[in-house]
Amino acid sequence: MNSMFRFWIPKTSISMQLRMLSTQTRQALEQAVKEDPIVLFMKGTPTRPMCGFSLKAIQILSLENVASDKLVTYNVLSNDELREGIKEFSDWPTIPQLYINGEFVGGSDILASMHKSGELHKILKEINALAPEQPKDSEEETTKKD
């Protein structure tokens, strides 16, 4: 046999199973990230995050004053297919994952960096995803009445 036409395949790649994202799961994820302006895939819920990174992401979005009607969250711990599927969908190995207007932004470290630089606030403002600010006068009046 001519060795020029033989291909060497390492044993590990033979036993390695590559999970392909099903068409149904891919379509569901595409719809989920495009359906709402801001979508966060996280461990737990906004009121009960189940990991420090998900907590950090929620805190950053809260500091940015994201309107609650613009944000949808998905608890990846509620469904194994969702947890693994979103990692394959984004080609990003960790949770949380933030999408803005259907585009993958990143995880909690990227969010923190964008928050610190002001870039995240600028994007959120451009897409009208920020909650209306409370007038300063009403806060002062409340304090004076107490």
Swiss-Prot record:
The gene is grx5. Its main location: mitochondrion. The keyword Lipid biosynthesis does not apply. It is found in: Mitochondrion. GO terms for cellular component: mitochondrial matrix; mitochondrion. It comes from Schizosaccharomyces pombe (strain 972 / ATCC 24843) (Fission yeast). Homodimer. Interacts with ISA1 and ISA2. Keywords: 2Fe-2S, Iron, Iron-sulfur, Metal-binding, Mitochondrion, Redox-active center. Belongs to the glutaredoxin family. Monothiol subfamily. This is Monothiol glutaredoxin-5, mitochondrial.
